[in-house]
């Protein structure tokens, strides 16, 4: 009932791997040539980079921040915020999409704050370092205190 000792039956044949590599190479070549012949790129380069697997999965904190801090237009703010985004140092324009942190009220371009959360893995305000997520929603899950996990371990023994 364990793993097979001979892993050859689990391997992908070499010709399949080489074919996939060639297809990927041609896809990248066509994408690189599209701008030179006046066509838009068919790959979305704003999506997660294939060379950076750490960006493939957003942290729970980043997902929660996305849900808890809505994106609004700068002109829709009721308060009198700062004149510029302290992350990119660009002045706010009335059409800018921004996020205003609920606890401290600081305002940032939504892309600047998203990069702060995702790329830097921060859950604090870039200015005052106040946490913008409730403490109970930003703590990691503790497998040791999970009743389900404990029951599963006991049932396998």
UniProtKB/Swiss-Prot annotation:
SMART domains: RING
Catalytic activity: S-ubiquitinyl-[E2 ubiquitin-conjugating enzyme]-L-cysteine + [acceptor protein]-L-lysine = [E2 ubiquitin-conjugating enzyme]-L-cysteine + N(6)-ubiquitinyl-[acceptor protein]-L-lysine
Record carries keyword rRNA-binding: no
InterPro entries attached to this UniProt entry: Znf_RING, Znf_RING/FYVE/PHD
Pathways involved: Protein modification; protein ubiquitination
UniProt KW keywords: Metal-binding, Transferase, Ubl conjugation pathway, Zinc, Zinc-finger
EC nos: 2.3.2.27
A single GO molecular function term of this UniProt record: ubiquitin-protein transferase activity
Keyword rRNA processing annotated: no
A GO BP entry: protein ubiquitination
Annotated function: Possesses E3 ubiquitin-protein ligase activity when associated with the E2 enzyme UBC8 in vitro.
Name the record gives this protein: E3 ubiquitin-protein ligase RHA1B
Organism: Arabidopsis thaliana (Mouse-ear cress)
